């Protein structure tokens, strides 16, 4: 455990922010730097079959140290950080023995406050690693990486019985490309766990069904003084479209298992407007109904337009709820829950109001629920992680490996 914090601080010092709308994978050069560093560290630790693909997926194996037909299992984290907030020049603050109250983030006005983030009340006495208020921290998912690397070291140093342990570090998870180039056959694990969750005890095997909706609106612009009966304002059409979307089914109005429509971006002029929505729902039937709703809205608003003016809608599915795949293998969850209890942690099964690489991997034949990292408030300058939470994650990973070795 001694090197856990050292590893984490080393990894977050590298800017690995991914970038949307880029064809190449990984989308940024910084991700390659971390991948090459991890490859070097895995080789130094003596892992075998260490490979780094041209698409930036790093894989390695810690060979079994006990005989028998023990299933190979995997642990996976992603190297990129969110495009939503800068990941350059991350300057972590270490707050030992947190005593409550606000934590100043750097020398500006930003604070980490229990008024805004009540979870802090539960973390008294712990060591918090925060940002300086200028960047995100990168615990999502460099905490997961540090935890996997430390767990490998613990398994080796303490000679804990285990089967083959596969590990993988992927790029571009935050822009939805993390699993698209993942070679499940080469990974060769019976099942895996992403280490990409939040607070201690979280175990997630349900996530949103997800789709993106891109709407192109073509209008007609003329001088406003002579516009009657001629102008078709694309911006007005965009406003009408959004007015038809249920206002009480937006991200800021929903929680738990509730789905939503989210207008993520809108831009345009009288001539042309573009809207980008994301649709999310845990229930597959409701998910399909939401997509139909968007098509109906576009058809309604576009009815009667001049042929040269039109509304074009393109819907693309992004990922699906992995629950339907994971529940076919209940022992995967049983082992994780038992491992947590053995580490004095009460498992908290909760839905992911988002997605992980594991969602896509589960539909590619690799059932892959998600384990906690001990981090909070991802994707922004209030992100933080607890050292104690990271240590617990290491213990759970090690215990999962140990329990799996007992399933001969």
Curated annotation (Swiss-Prot):
This is Peptidase T. PANTHER family: PEPTIDASE T. Cleaves the N-terminal amino acid of tripeptides. Keywords: Aminopeptidase, Cytoplasm, Hydrolase, Metal-binding, Metalloprotease, Protease, Zinc. GO terms for cellular component: cytosol. The keyword Thylakoid does not apply. One of its GO terms (molecular function) is metallopeptidase activity. Belongs to the peptidase M20B family. InterPro entries: ArgE/DapE_CS (IPR001261), Bact_exopeptidase_dim_dom (IPR036264), Peptidase_M20 (IPR002933), Peptidase_M20_dimer (IPR011650), Peptidase_M20B (IPR010161). Zn(2+) 2 binds at residues 140, 174, 379. It is found in: Cytoplasm. The active site is at 80, 173 (proton acceptor). It catalyses: Release of the N-terminal residue from a tripeptide.
